[in-house]
């Protein structure tokens, strides 16, 4: 029988895999980072499940650390976290271009699955 698709479980597994590796992980984990960031922008309240375990330092690239910090800030302000709000936060901080622009953020949401 086919395994049921459970996005929350899959994303939790991705978050756990990201945090199990001590220090910075090699560049081949960039795809995992992309999926994690994409999931955070797609799944309501997913930041609550990972904030205790994932810090900006868990991300290998500075761009991903910057995106994660923006997501954390929105969470601390009790604001919704989605593609639009993350884009606007990065734009307000003049960091949107630094992370690859709105199109890169949109691509991150397509990495989940």
Where are the predicted features?
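Noncatalytic partner-interaction/assembly domains of nucleic-acid and motor enzyme complexes
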Residues: 1-113
């Amino acid at each position: 029988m086919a395994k049921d698709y459970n996005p929350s479980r899959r994303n939790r597994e991705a978050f756990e895999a990201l945090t199990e590796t001590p220090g910075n992980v090699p560049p081949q984990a960039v795809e995992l980072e992309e999926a994690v960031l994409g999931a955070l922008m797609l799944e309501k309240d997913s930041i609550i499940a990972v904030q205790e375990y994932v810090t900006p330092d868990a991300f290998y690239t500075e761009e991903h650390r910057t995106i994660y910090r923006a997501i954390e800030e929105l969470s601390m302000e009790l604001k919704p976290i989605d593609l639009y709000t993350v884009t606007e936060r990065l734009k307000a901080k003049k960091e949107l271009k630094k992370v690859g622009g709105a199109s890169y953020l949109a691509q991150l949401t397509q990495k989940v699955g």
